[in-house]
């Protein structure tokens, strides 16, 4: 309702040169479900995807280096979205506190929505072992070698984690994300 504050908050964790579809669609889709949404990346303000679209980044990934801000972000958000983008993930997976954030988020059983190369962050966060995980076909071996069971499906659910291999299945993926979120598995 207009004028009332939304209570649910989603955080999209990415870096410049993200896969455009995988940021733009979830950004608007979560708002349709009543979430406020912020993008956390390597710089504040306008950031660009690999196809040239842009979004406004309102949170800095470097905030996670400050323990008070780390905890604030952990407590402020209800849903974590990890989009793909090969170059973006190469940089983001080098940010140790971003990886620690994902691991702690998972430990708290909060919902994680991950798509395409975003699975590389799951691997680097060491949360894939023993789980069903999907991701882009070119990282299938990486997913399997991390101890996960690679599943090539549009919306792979493993407890609080919902993963997807490709943006062509974003509709099914986001539907599953909201089901997991609402069920309390996240």
What do these predicted regions represent?
Residues 133:
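Anionic-ligand binding patches
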Residues 3-108, 120-130, 140-186:
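Extended, subdomain-level signal for the structured scaffold at the beginning of enzyme domains
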Residues 114-118:
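Short, thiol/selenol-centered motifs that function as redox-active sites or metal-ligating centers
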């Amino acid at each position: 309702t207009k004028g009332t504050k939304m209570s649910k908050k989603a955080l999209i964790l990415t870096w410049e040169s993200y896969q455009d579809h995988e940021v733009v669609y979830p950004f608007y889709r979560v708002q349709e479900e009543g979430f406020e949404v912020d993008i956390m990346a390597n710089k504040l303000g306008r950031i660009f995807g690999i196809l040239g679209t842009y979004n406004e980044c309102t949170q800095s990934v470097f905030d996670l280096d400050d323990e008070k801000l780390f905890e604030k972000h952990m407590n402020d958000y209800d849903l974590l979205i990890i989009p793909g983008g090969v170059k973006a993930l190469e940089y983001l997976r080098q940010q140790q506190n971003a990886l620690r954030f994902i691991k702690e988020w998972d430990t708290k059983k909060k919902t994680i929505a991950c798509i395409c190369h975003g699975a590389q962050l799951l691997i680097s966060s060491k949360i894939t072992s023993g789980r069903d995980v999907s991701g882009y076909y070119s990282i299938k071996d990486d997913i399997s070698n991390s101890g996960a069971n690679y599943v090539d499906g549009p919306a792979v659910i493993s407890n609080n984690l919902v993963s997807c291999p490709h943006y062509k299945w974003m509709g099914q993926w986001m539907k599953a994300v909201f089901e997991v979120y609402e069920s309390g598995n996240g």
